[in-house]
Amino acid sequence: MLDKLSQTEHLDRDELYNCIESMFDMSSKVRVYRHLTDYSGNYDEVYNEYAVLNLKEVEQKLADYYLDHVLLEETKDIEHLYYVPKVVTTYLKCEALKALVYNHLGQKVYATDKCGQSDFVIFDDSAVLLLDFTPEGALKGGFLSTLPDDVKYVSDVYDEYRQGAVDYLKRVPCETSTKNGLNRKINQLKSSLNLK
């Protein structure tokens, strides 16, 4: 996505966090898109990692930062989208993410099998931040653009994936994401893999 933007300013991690904090305070509407990738290459490990709410020390928490703060700011209009990379494993991973976000953060989750390539945040349709991660998933920094054309492009991409998520969820059977339901899925998964 970065190569589609006309003009960006590179920010290191500290600059990115400072920028986010100041922009968030000034914003009435923030849209967060999170491109969730299995950085380890191991689907089962990632599923269990999210299911038991153990995020380890991976600095992939920028969207969570917003969600945590948004819960304290009921006037904020937040929309967010989680990407699920492989269709064949989408159902279980979607359920784990639903439990993580809905039960613990009070937010609904959308999941889509489309790939946006980037995590990004849009502030009031006037600025966009793209997040820059290492291959292991650590947050390095980001790119900021306030050009109207850039913001519109990213907003259009966001809307495209949001619609994709809505269409996708219509095809996925829904199940209440309770702790018991999630534990049952984990046990089923472990049994199928002969894990203890």
PLM feature spans:
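Contiguous, function-dense segments enriched for cysteine-driven chemistry
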Residues: F24-D25, A99, L169-K170
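HKD (HxKxxxxD) catalytic microenvironment of the phospholipase D
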Residues: D113-P148
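Signature of lipid phosphatidyltransferase scaffolds
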Residues: T134-K196
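Short, solvent-exposed polar/charged micro-motifs at secondary-structure junctions
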Residues: N42-Y47, T89-K93, Q117-I122, L182
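A structural signal for short, well-ordered beta-strand segments and their strand-loop junctions
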Residues: R31-L36, E79-Y82, Y110-T112, V121-F123, ...
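Short catalytic/ligand-binding loop motif for oxyanion handling, primarily in non-cytosolic enzymes
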Residues: G41-D44, V87-Y91, L129-L131, G137-A138
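PLD-like (HKD) phosphodiesterase/transphosphatidyltransferase domain
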Residues: M1-K86
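HKD-type phospholipase D/PLD-like phosphodiesterase module
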Residues: K86-Q117
